């Protein structure tokens, strides 16, 4: 009796041979479609625009940071500089307290003392200026409330009205800012003062 399982496992049985598997062609999921060149060109242009915007923002940030650092260096000493001005004022008051006649007739000791005070004042002002703090004297200029504070009026028809004719206390700038306005006396009674050509008080340092 013939076992049917033997014929099924017979390698020479042509019915057992499997049919060949035909693979389908592989298609890339991102294969470009017809007419997509314009879309890619648009995407490239948008990417370039974003890159340029990012670079511009980075450059603006760099400039802003540099400016903030410079301001911090310049104006970080504002409080200290304002306190030091009291010392400069006291030195100036000490010199102003000595009459010109006394100076002319002073002995060697007093002259040496006066010269020492003058040297100290100059050294202090030079140190302040090295750190961006500059003294200004607006005498003869048109009164400007941005840089000066009027303490009183001086009747004087010989000069244009609104002209600074006396300085009670010198002003100081720190960088481009007013550290302390000058205390001044302003003329009254003359012709109206002409507009100032420039309000840059730092150019009138004493």
From Swiss-Prot:
Location of the region described as Disordered in the Swiss-Prot/TrEMBL record: 1-38
N-terminal signal peptide: none
Swiss-Prot/TrEMBL keywords: Chaperone, Cytoplasm, Stress response
Lineage: superkingdom: Bacteria
Entry's transmembrane regions: none
Pfam families registered for this protein in UniProt: GrpE (PF01025)
Record-linked InterPro entries: GrpE, GrpE_coiled_coil, GrpE_head
GO function terms (MF aspect): adenyl-nucleotide exchange factor activity; protein homodimerization activity; protein-folding chaperone binding; unfolded protein binding
UniProt keyword Isomerase, yes or no: no
Disulfide bond entries: none
GO cellular component: cytoplasm
GO terms (BP aspect): protein folding
Coiled coil: none
SUPFAM superfamilies: Coiled-coil domain of nucleotide exchange factor GrpE, Head domain of nucleotide exchange factor GrpE
Comp. bias regions, Basic and acidic residues: 1-10
Subcellular location: Cytoplasm
Keyword Cytoplasm: yes
Subunit structure: Homodimer.
PANTHER family: GRPE PROTEIN, GRPE PROTEIN HOMOLOG, MITOCHONDRIAL
Function as written in the Swiss-Prot or TrEMBL entry: Participates actively in the response to hyperosmotic and heat shock by preventing the aggregation of stress-denatured proteins, in association with DnaK and GrpE. It is the nucleotide exchange factor for DnaK and may function as a thermosensor. Unfolded proteins bind initially to DnaJ; upon interaction with the DnaJ-bound protein, DnaK hydrolyzes its bound ATP, resulting in the formation of a stable complex. GrpE releases ADP from DnaK; ATP binding to DnaK triggers the release of the substrate protein, thus completing the reaction cycle.
Family statement drawn from the similarity comment of this UniProt entry: Belongs to the GrpE family.
Record-given protein name: Protein GrpE
Species of the source: Bradyrhizobium sp. (strain ORS 278)
Taxonomy of the source species: Bacteria, Pseudomonadati, Pseudomonadota, Alphaproteobacteria, Hyphomicrobiales
Gene behind the chain: grpE
């Amino acid at each position: 009796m013939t076992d049917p399982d033997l014929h099924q496992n017979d390698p020479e049985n042509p019915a057992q041979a499997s049919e060949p598997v035909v693979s389908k062609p592989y298609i890339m999921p991102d294969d470009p479609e017809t007419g997509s060149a314009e879309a890619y060109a648009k995407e490239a242009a948008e990417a370039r625009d974003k890159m340029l915007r990012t670079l511009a923002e980075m450059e603006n940030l760099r400039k802003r940071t540099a400016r903030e650092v410079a301001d911090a260096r310049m104006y970080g000493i504002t409080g200290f500089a304002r306190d030091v001005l009291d010392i400069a004022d006291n030195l100036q008051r000490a010199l102003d307290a000595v009459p010109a006649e006394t100076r002319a007739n002073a002995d060697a000791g007093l002259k040496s003392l006066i010269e020492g005070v003058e040297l100290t004042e100059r050294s202090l002002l030079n140190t302040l200026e090295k750190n961006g703090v500059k003294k200004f004297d607006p005498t003869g200029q048109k009164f400007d409330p941005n840089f000066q504070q009027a303490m009183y009026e001086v009747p004087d028809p010989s000069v244009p009205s609104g002209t600074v004719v006396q300085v009670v206390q010198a002003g100081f700038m720190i960088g481009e800012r007013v550290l302390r306005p000058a205390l001044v006396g302003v003329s009254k009674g003359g012709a109206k003062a002409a507009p100032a050509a420039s309000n840059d008080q730092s150019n009138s340092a004493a």
